A protein has these predicted regions:
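Bacterial signal peptide processing site
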Residues: 26-28
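Active-site-proximal beta-strand elements of phosphoester/diester hydrolases
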Residues: 68-78, 188-198, 223-227, 283-291, ...
Length: 342
């Protein structure tokens, strides 16, 4: 009897083939690497902290230095207003041109602006200078004896001058025969007081008004403008002694006095004991300036204020002659410095 081999059905064979294929794939796949384990006694360290430097503290900015400033001082221009208008024209041009470079903040005039205050054409001549800087910087004029008429001695003509309208009514007495103004420069507060020729004699109550003004502004450095105060030798005129006693001596804030009228130049330092302790603690610098003669046409003074040293440099110059003034006999310059002048 012939035996036949048993045969697998097609279905069984297919299942066997599938099983063999799956086993082969499982053997060929790489095993996943086990996660490394830390030793039992190890301690995981925290990340080192990031060092943050503190922001630098900015250095304080240095305090700004106070700025020097200047005033122009004109005086006794009567001869120029009478017959040398070209000199006034050059003075006005120079002042206007130097406003920025010299930091000019005002123009003083200590009187005798014209030769005869009742002649309008002389005021027109002075306008050649005035209109070059008026409206740009303040103009501080006081009347001289020529401005009110040498014989008439009447303020009526002078007080009608238009430039006095630059002062508000409350800052004028006698329609402008006396005035004051306030300004600040170089870190210092100032008051400028203008007292016209014999105004304290002609206008009743002038001394009381002046005293009230200076007392109300006692914390400001006082600059006083007179026409007549002292002569070329530095001596007080007899008729000016009351002004000296009741204005300059009586008010501790007055530090500078400017005047004209007499001939030449002079400087005097006055000392006052304001607190009555027997020691003079206040010094006032008084200056007279009035150069005469054709060789001196057009001279003015530039006053340079230094806020750090508190000094005032005095420069004497003529834009008309384009020269600085020197003593013709000695060759000595008229320029000097007032130490601790304000």
């Amino acid at each position: 009897m012939q035996h036949r081999r048993p045969t697998l059905s097609p279905i069984v064979m297919a299942l066997l083939a599938l099983c063999l294929l799956c086993c082969a794939c499982a053997k060929s796949a790489p095993a996943a690497a086990p996660a490394p384990s830390a030793p039992a006694d190890s301690v995981q360290e925290s990340p080192a902290p990031v060092q943050v430097s503190p922001a630098p503290v900015p250095s304080p900015s240095p305090s700004p230095q106070p700025t020097p400033f200047s005033f122009v001082w004109m005086t006794d221009t009567q001869a120029l207003s009478y017959h040398v208008p070209d000199a006034l024209d050059s003075m006005g041009d120079w002042i206007s041109a130097k406003i920025e470079t010299e930091n000019i903040i005002g123009v003083f005039h200590t009187g005798d602006i014209v030769d005869n205050g009742f002649k309008s054409w002389e005021w027109d001549n002075f306008d050649l200078a005035l209109q070059k800087f008026r409206g740009k910087i303040p103009f501080y004029p006081v009347a001289g004896n020529h401005d009110i008429g040498v014989r008439a001695q009447n303020y009526e003509g002078y007080t009608h001058c238009d430039f006095l309208n630059d002062f508000p009514p409350e800052r004028k007495f006698g329609d402008g025969a006396v005035f004051y103004d306030l300004f600040s420069a170089g870190g210092t507060d100032f008051i400028v007081l203008g007292v016209g020729f014999d105004a304290t004699r002609q206008f009743e109550g002038a001394f009381d008004w002046i005293d009230a003004v200076l007392q109300a502004h006692r914390d400001r450095v006082g600059i006083v403008l007179f026409h007549r105060y002292m002569d070329g030798k530095g001596e007080t005129f007899k008729k000016s002694r009351e002004n000296q006693e009741r204005i300059v001596a009586a008010n501790p804030n007055v530090r500078l006095v400017l005047c004209g009228h007499s001939s030449g130049v002079s400087t005097r330092y006055e000392s006052y004991d304001d607190d009555g302790d027997g020691t003079a603690e206040r010094r006032v610098c008084a200056m007279m300036f009035n150069l005469k003669g054709s060789a001196s046409y057009g001279f003015l003074r530039l006053l340079r204020f230094d806020p750090l040293s508190r000094s005032i440099e005095i420069v004497t110059y003529s834009p008309y002659r384009d020269c600085y003034h020197v003593n013709r006999k000695t060759g000595e310059s008229l320029d000097f410095t007032v130490e601790k002048g304000f």
